[in-house]
Structure formats: C-alpha cells, structure tokens
Amino acid sequence: NLSKLSVIPFIIGGFIMSNHLAPFHFDIVGSFLRPAELKEARQAFTDGKISREDLTAVEDRLITDLIKKQKAAGLPVITDGEFRRAYWHLDFMWGFNGVKEIELEHGYKFHGQETAPGSLALTGKITGTNHPFVEHFKFVKQFEDEHTTARQTIPAPSQFLAELFREDNGTVTRSFYPDLEELIQDIAAAYRQVIKDLYDAGCRNIQFDDCTWGMCCDHGYWTGRQKDKSVTIEGETAKYLRVNNLALEGRPQDLAFTTHVCRGNYNSTWAASGGYEPVAPILFAKENVDAYY
C-alpha cells in the first residue's frame, strides 16, 4: 500500500540532496511486502503444483502492477519490490557460480522471532558470470521513463562475506579459501562482474543492502562473537569496508551507488539495535558510496 509508504530523506556530505538524478531528495529502499497471490504461487511452485514458467508469469504481472503504483505515487525510482526472491539477500548469493543453497539448523534470530533456516555453502571458487539478477533487472528497465530510474537492489559484498562464515559455514568456506584475502578478492571480482553486466543492461542506479554494520553496533551480538578472542570489531569492520570498496572499484562515473544500512526487518521485528558510534568513522567516512539510507 503506497499510501502508507515511508519515504526516506537522506544526507550526503552534510546536505540534503535535491537532484533530479540519484541520489534523490526523497527515496525508498525498494523492498515491498509480497502480495498474498505471490506467496501462494511460490508455495504452489515449491509443492510442484505449478511450473517455473507459471510462477514467473505471476511475478511478472505483480511486478508490473507494483511499478504502476510506484509511478502513480511520483517516486523517482522503480524496483521489482524484490518479488522474485525468497530472501532479501540469499537469492542473489545463490546466483553466483560456486555457491549452492542449503539449510541450517536455525534461521536468523529476530526480536522474539526466527526466520526460515536458509543459507549457502560453497561448491567451488566464486565467480559472477551469467548472474540471473541481470535478467530480473531487464524486466524492470523496460518501464523506465523520463521521470523514473530503474534501480537494482543487491546485498552488499560484506553481507555475502558474513554469510560465508555464519554458524558452521566457515568450515566449508575455508576448505575452498584457506586464504581470507583470496576470498575477499574473489567476492569483489564477482560483484564487479555483476555490476558491469547490470550497467551494460542499462542500469544506472544500484543499492547495496547491508545488515553487517547494524550487527556491529549491537551489544548482544558482540557479546556472543567475543567468545572467539580473535574476533574484534576493528577487524570485522575493516574486512567489511575492504570487500565493499573493492567491489566498487572502477565503476562508471554515471552509475549511482547507494547503500541501505539495515537493522533487519522480519514481521515488523528487528535483529540488531544500538548507536552507530562503533562503526561511524569507518562506514560514513570511508565507504565509497554516493549516499546512505
């Protein structure tokens, strides 16, 4: 319901932006609640009752309807609402070569709730060729006009890096990448490939969605992480900054790049809390993006 949509103003360089090009004076993060029809179709596909083509047809129609609503509301960007995804982040990660879908014993822990237990595991070295999200973007691009910009939202490289070491995932990850620097370089290279392919498909606005910084601000999260004495907030934030900035190297000047720093949102609950003081000097001063939400 766009009438209840939260519009997010944001700041870059100390000034509220008011350009007709991104970054915009007001904006959205691009993810929308899934319609009941979409959830029912996805469940029917999982149960083997409809084909992939049938599911895609439902997605196409509902995304088209959503874009019409975004335009009618006067929004400067249009997105697919992330309607083709089961998770906001994992579907993109599963699209890399060398990555497969798995389930863990537990899902992500939110305030009083737990998500489905989806995750990932490596099957080989990570590359970014032929990523399915490029085709997803092309569908949205066709609706772009002189008043709107088609945006592609993707999880940040730091989020991918964190997922590779979530719970027991690190054991498999280290079997393919005993050298952390090689892993960081391959993640960044895979992202650069996808970014190039999106750009070649006409994308001029990409958003990194990133919960890693929010987790670094959460006292309870760090209490648990510090059971491993080798883990420090300085070390973790340095890794996250490095992989994100490496992924952004060489991007075209006319490609706007923003980031949404999120505390998690599942059934209106949160995964992390706390002020930005632990990460502000790194995140806001050194990450090479055009704007933050």
Question: Which residues are covered by each model-predicted region?
Answer:
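Short, Lys/Arg-enriched N-terminal segments with co-localized hydrophobic residues
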Residues: N1-I16
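Domain-level signal for soluble alpha/beta catalytic cores
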Residues: F15-Y293
